[in-house]
C-alpha cells in the first residue's frame, strides 16, 4: 500500500518534506535500471526509493515526447517518496511560479496546508489566469457528511450528461464530483471531470477543491490533451483557490465566436434535458423493431393484430346487405393485401396457347411457400399510389375503411432517363435487333421512316388490307411470290425424299424477309392469303434457328400490318363475315401453333424479350389488344418469358441485368396498356353478331381471361391492383351472367316433363356456367383469390 501513500513500516516523518531531498533526478536519464524491481518499488516493508518517475519535461527522447503528448507540463517527482516521507508545511522561500518549469506549483502536495485550487491550464482556456491577490479567502472545512451531500447534489444536477471515461492514472475511489466542462479550443460538449480522492492517511482539506465550473482541455489538436498524475503548471498560490467568479469572468473574455458556440451548446443541452427520460431504451427498441418488421414482413395486413380486430368488427355489422354487396366488400377487402398474390405468384411454362394459363394457375396453387423469401428479396413490394416520403421509406396516404393503417414502403430507384429503354435494348446482345427497328438494315432512310410512322394507322385507314398490299408491291406480286415459294418447297421436299442435299437459299430469298424496298414487307402481305398461311409449316421444316427467329421478328415487328389483325379487331371490323371468322381461326390454328412450338423448344429468355420489345416499340399495343390474334400473341410471349424466368430462378441461370431488363420491358408494356385494359373486352353488340353467325348461344372469352391472368402473373402488386380496378365491372358482369344461368338451370331442372332437347339445353347451360366460373377463377387464382359460393374469398 506504499504506492498509495499508506506506509505500514512506520517510516513517516514528522517534519515537513523538502522537495529537493525527495527528488534525485532519475527521470532525466534515458535508462532507469531500478524501476523493474517490483518488490522494492511496491513492497510493503521495503525501503522505498525516490526514483519512481511519472515524467519529466527536461528529459529528452521518448520521455520528453511522452510528456509533450500529454499536453501538460508536469514536473518529475516520486509520489511514493512523497507519501512515504510525510506531509510538510508550505515552503517559505516565497518564490512565485514564473514559468511552466517552475516546481512551486507542486508545493502543496508536500505541504500541510490545504492544496491549491485547480487552475485551468494554458492549453485549455484563452482567458488569463487570475492574480494571487484576486483569490477568494478560504472556506471553512466541511465534514464528510457535507461532502457526500454536495456530491449527491452535483450528481443529481448533471446526471443526464454523458460522462467521460475515467482518466488513466487516477485511482478509483468514492463517488466522484462532477463539473460542467466549459468549451475549450472551440469544441463545446458536455463532459465530467473527476478529481482523484485524497489518500486516507493524508490530511488534505477537500473543501478547498473548487466547486464551480472547471475548464478541462478537450481534443482540439492532433495530439490529444490528456490528464496525468501531476497537476498543470500555472501561477497558483499554495494556500489560495480560484473563486467561483473566475469562471464567469472568463466567459466575458471569450471571443464572439466562442460565445456563440457556447450558447449553441447550452441550447442543445437544454433541448436534450427537456425530453430526457421520455422513452426508456426498451420503448425505443420496441419502436425500432416494429418499424423494421413493417419493412420486411411478407403479409403486413394479416400480421397486424389491430387490422384483424377491425375486420372482425366490420364483418359483425353486416346483416342487411345484398349478395353483390357482400361480394364487392370481400373483393375490396382482399384487394388491399391479398390481391397481388406477390408471394404466391409463380412463373410457369405454357407449352400450348390454350393450356398455358391453366398450368400456371395449377402450379401457383401447388407451389411451396419457400419461394416467398426469394420474391421478397427481389423487392416486389413497391406501390406507386399516393405516397409520402419519410425517414424509413414511403407511407401510403390512401386510407379508407378497409385500409385503416399506413403501410410502410421501401423507396426504389426508378430510371428517369427517357433513353433507359434504349439501354435495355442494347443489352440484348444475342438478338439481331438491327433489322427490327425498321423494315431493313440496308436503307437508313427506310429505317427512319419506319420509326416515325405508326403501323396501326394503316389498319384504321383500310379495314380490308388493300392498302397494305399496295405498299408491299400489289396483290399480283404477292400471289406470284406465294407460287414461287410453293415451287421451291416442292423441290426441297423432292430432294429430301430422294436423299439429296437440300439448299433452302432460293426459298429464303423468295420470302423477301430482308427486302427493304417496300413500306410493308412482302412476307407480311403473304400471310394475308390462306395459301400463304398454310405453307408456313412446310417452310419452317427447311429453316435453321436464326432464319426462324428472323421470321418471327418480322411478324412481331409489323404485326399491325397483318390483315388477320385487322379482321379480328372489333374496332376495324365491327361486323365480321363468316369467311373472315374462318380465316381468323385458320391463322390461330397454324401460325400460333408454329410460334408456340418455336418459343417452347428453341428460344431463350433474351430472344423472347427481344420479340416483345419489337412488338412494343413498332406497334400500337392498345390496338393489338382489341384483336383476338394480337391478344393471343402477347399472351404467348409473356407466358413463355414467365416460364423461362421460373426455370432459371431454380437453376440460377438468369443474371441480374437480365431480370432488370425484363422488368423494364414489362413496365413498358404495361404503360402502353394502362387505362385501356377494359378495352380488350369486345362490346355486347360484337359478341351478339358473332353468336348469330356461328349459331351459338355462348361467347367464349377464355382468351381474354388468359391474357389478364398472364399479365397479372408476370406483374407486381401495383400492376395487379391497376388491372383489378380497370376490369372490376367485367368481373361483376361475369358473375351476374353466371348467376343468371344458374337460376335458369334451377328452373329447367324442376320441370316435370323432360325431353331430349330440354336435356341438351340444360347441359349447355351447366357447361356455360361452369366455363364462366372457370375463366374468372383462372384470373383470380393467380392473385390468391377465388369466387366460390357467391363471394370472392381468399384461395385456400
Swiss-Prot record:
GO cellular component: cytoplasm; cytoplasmic stress granule; cytosolic small ribosomal subunit; kinetochore; Lsm1-7-Pat1 complex; nucleus; P-body
Residues modified as N-acetylserine: 2
Main location: cytoplasm
Modified residue annotations for Phosphoserine: 456-457
Region (Disordered): 1-21, 164-200, 365-465
Bias-annotated ranges (Low complexity): 165-192, 406-415, 434-450
Domain remark from Swiss-Prot or TrEMBL: The region at residues 254 to 422 is required for stimulation of decapping. The region at residues 422 to 763 is required for PAT1 and LSM1 to accumulate in P-bodies and responsible for translation repression and P-body assembly.
Family that this chain belongs to: Belongs to the PAT1 family.
Quaternary context: Associates with the 40S ribosomal subunit. Associates with the heptameric LSM1-LSM7 complex. Interacts directly with LSM2 and LSM3 within the LSM1-LSM7 complex. Interacts with DHH1, LSM1, LSM5, RPB4, RPB7 and with topoisomerase TOP2. Interacts with CDC33, PAB1, TIF4631 and TIF4632 in an RNA-dependent manner. Binds mRNAs.
Identification of the protein by name: Deadenylation-dependent mRNA-decapping factor PAT1
Taxonomic path: Eukaryota, Fungi, Dikarya, Ascomycota, Saccharomycotina
Amino acid at each position: 500500500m506504499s504506492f498509495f501513500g499508506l506506509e505500514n513500516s512506520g517510516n513517516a516523518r514528522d517534519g515537513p518534506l523538502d522537495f529537493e531531498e525527495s527528488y534525485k533526478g532519475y527521470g532525466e536519464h534515458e535508462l532507469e535500471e531500478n524501476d523493474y524491481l517490483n518488490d522494492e518499488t511496491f513492497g510493503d516493508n521495503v525501503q522505498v526509493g525516490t526514483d519512481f518517475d511519472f515524467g519529466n519535461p527536461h528529459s529528452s527522447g521518448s520521455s520528453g515526447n511522452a510528456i509533450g503528448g500529454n499536453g501538460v507540463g508536469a514536473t518529475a517527482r516520486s509520489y511514493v517518496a512523497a507519501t512515504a516521507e510525510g506531509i510538510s508545511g508550505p515552503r517559505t522561500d516565497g518564490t512565485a511560479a514564473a514559468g511552466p518549469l517552475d516546481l512551486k506549483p507542486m508545493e502543496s502536495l508536500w505541504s500541510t496546508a490545504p492544496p491549491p485550487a485547480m487552475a485551468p491550464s494554458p492549453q485549455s482556456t484563452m482567458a488569463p489566469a487570475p492574480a494571487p491577490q484576486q483569490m477568494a479567502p478560504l472556506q471553512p472545512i466541511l465534514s464528510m457528511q457535507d461532502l457526500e451531500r454536495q456530491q449527491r447534489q452535483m450528481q443529481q444536477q448533471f446526471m443526464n450528461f454523458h460522462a467521460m471515461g475515467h482518466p488513466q492514472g487516477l485511482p478509483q475511489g468514492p463517488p466522484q464530483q462532477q463539473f460542467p466542462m466549459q468549451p475549450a479550443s472551440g469544441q463545446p460538449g458536455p463532459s465530467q471531470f473527476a478529481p482523484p480522492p485524497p489518500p486516507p492517511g493524508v490530511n488534505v482539506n477537500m473543501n478547498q477543491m473548487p466547486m464551480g465550473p472547471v475548464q478541462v482541455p478537450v481534443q482540439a489538436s492532433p495530439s490529444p490533451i490528456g490528464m496525468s498524475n501531476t497537476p498543470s503548471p500555472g501561477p497558483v498560490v499554495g494556500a489560495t483557490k480560484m473563486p467561483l467568479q473566475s469562471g464567469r469572468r472568463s466567459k466575458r473574455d471569450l471571443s464572439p465566436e466562442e460565445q456563440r458556440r457556447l450558447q449553441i451548446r447550452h441550447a442543445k443541452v437544454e433541448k436534450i434535458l427537456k425530453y430526457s427520460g421520455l422513452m426508456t431504451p426498451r420503448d425505443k427498441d420496441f419502436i425500432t423493431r416494429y418499424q423494421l418488421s413493417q419493412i420486411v414482413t411478407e403479409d403486413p395486413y394479416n400480421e397486424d393484430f389491430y387490422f384483424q380486430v377491425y375486420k372482425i368488427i366490420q364483418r359483425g355489422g353486416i346483416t342487411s346487405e345484398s349478395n353483390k354487396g357482400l361480394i364487392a366488400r370481400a373483393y375490396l377487402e382482399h384487394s388491399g393485401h391479398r390481391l397481388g398474390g406477390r408471394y404466391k405468384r409463380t412463373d410457369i411454362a405454357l407449352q400450348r396457347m390454350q393450356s398455358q394459363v391453366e398450368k400456371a394457375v395449377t402450379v401457383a396453387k401447388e407451389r411451396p411457400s419457400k419461394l416467398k423469401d426469394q420474391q421478397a428479396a427481389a423487392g416486389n413490394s413497391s406501390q406507386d399510389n399516393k405516397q409520402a416520403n419519410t425517414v424509413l421509406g414511403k407511407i401510403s396516404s390512401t386510407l379508407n375503411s378497409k385500409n385503416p393503417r399506413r403501410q410502410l414502403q421501401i423507396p426504389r430507384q426508378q430510371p428517369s432517363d427517357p433513353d433507359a429503354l434504349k439501354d435495355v435494348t442494347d443489352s440484348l446482345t444475342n438478338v439481331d435487333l438491327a433489322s427490327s427497328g425498321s423494315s431493313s438494315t440496308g436503307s437508313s432512310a427506310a429505317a427512319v421512316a419506319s420509326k416515325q410512322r405508326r403501323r396501326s394507322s394503316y389498319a384504321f385507314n383500310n379495314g380490308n388490307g388493300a392498302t397494305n398490299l399496295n405498299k408491299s408491291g400489289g396483290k399480283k406480286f404477292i400471289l406470284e411470290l406465294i407460287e414461287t415459294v410453293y415451287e421451291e418447297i416442292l423441290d426441297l421436299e423432292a430432294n429430301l425424299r430422294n436423299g439429296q442435299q437440300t439448299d433452302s437459299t432460293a426459298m429464303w430469298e423468295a420470302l423477301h424477309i430482308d427486302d427493304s424496298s417496300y413500306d410493308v414487307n412482302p412476307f407480311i402481305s403473304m400471310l394475308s392469303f390462306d395459301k400463304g398461311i398454310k405453307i408456313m409449316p412446310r417452310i419452317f421444316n427447311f429453316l435453321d434457328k436464326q432464319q426462324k427467329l428472323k421470321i418471327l421478328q418480322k411478324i412481331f415487328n409489323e404485326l399491325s400490318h397483318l390483315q388477320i389483325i385487322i379482321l379480328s379487331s372489333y374496332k376495324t371490323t365491327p361486323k365480321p363475315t363468316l369467311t373472315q371468322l374462318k380465316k381468323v381461326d385458320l391463322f390461330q390454328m397454324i401460325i400460333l401453333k408454329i410460334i408456340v412450338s418455336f418459343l417452347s423448344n428453341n428460344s431463350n429468355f433474351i430472344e423472347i424479350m427481344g420479340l416483345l420489345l419489337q412488338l412494343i416499340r413498332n406497334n400500337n399495343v392498345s390496338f393489338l389488344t382489341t384483336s383476338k390474334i394480337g391478344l393471343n400473341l402477347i399472351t404467348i410471349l409473356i407466358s413463355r418469358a414467365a416460364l423461362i424466368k421460373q426455370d432459371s430462378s431454380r437453376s440460377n441461370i438468369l443474371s441480374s441485368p437480365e431480370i432488370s431488363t425484363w422488368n423494364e420491358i414489362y413496365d413498358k408494356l404495361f404503360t402502353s396498356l394502362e387505362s385501356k385494359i377494359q378495352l380488350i373486352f369486345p362490346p355486347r353488340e360484337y359478341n351478339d353478331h358473332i353468336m348469330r353467325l356461328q349459331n351459338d348461344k355462348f361467347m367464349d372469352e377464355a382468351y381474354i381471361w388468359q391474357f389478364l391472368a398472364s399479365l397479372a402473373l408476370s406483374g407486381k402488386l401495383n400492376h395487379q391492383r391497376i388491372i383489378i380496378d380497370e376490369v372490376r365491372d367485367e368481373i361483376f358482369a361475369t358473375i351476374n351472367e353466371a348467376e343468371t344461368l344458374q337460376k335458369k338451370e334451377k328452373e329447367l331442372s324442376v320441370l316435370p316433363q323432360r325431353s331430349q332437347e330440354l336435356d341438351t339445353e340444360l347441359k349447355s347451360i351447366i357447361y356455360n356456367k361452369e366455363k364462366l366460373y372457370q375463366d374468372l377463377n383462372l384470373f383470380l387464382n393467380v392473385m390468391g383469390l377465388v369466387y366460390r359460393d357467391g363471394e370472392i374469398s381468399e384461395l385456400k
